[in-house]
């Protein structure tokens, strides 16, 4: 079975580049792992229903799974303290 292709928008790639080196390595390794098993994370709830999270130290990768296209769309990468509030605010504004 072929893996899933990661889809990383430019703003998320910029956020990854700005992370500390150890976290950046962890995020890159996590994206590779998620490409092989996108269900390895945990599903989110409420406003973020349909998205998943994956933990890398104090940071979170938030992503969606498109099983038909076999892609994982990385929605955001950030510190756990702020990432969910930012995404929930974005979801409410839609």
Residue ranges and their predicted role:
Residues 1-6, 18, 25, 64-94:
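Enriched for short, Lys/Arg-rich terminal
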Residues 3-43:
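N-terminal first-folded block
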Residues 26-28, 32, 51, 57, ...:
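Short amphipathic alpha-helical "recognition" segments used for binding
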Residues 39-82:
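Basic/aromatic recognition patch in beta-strand/loop cores that engages polyanionic ligands
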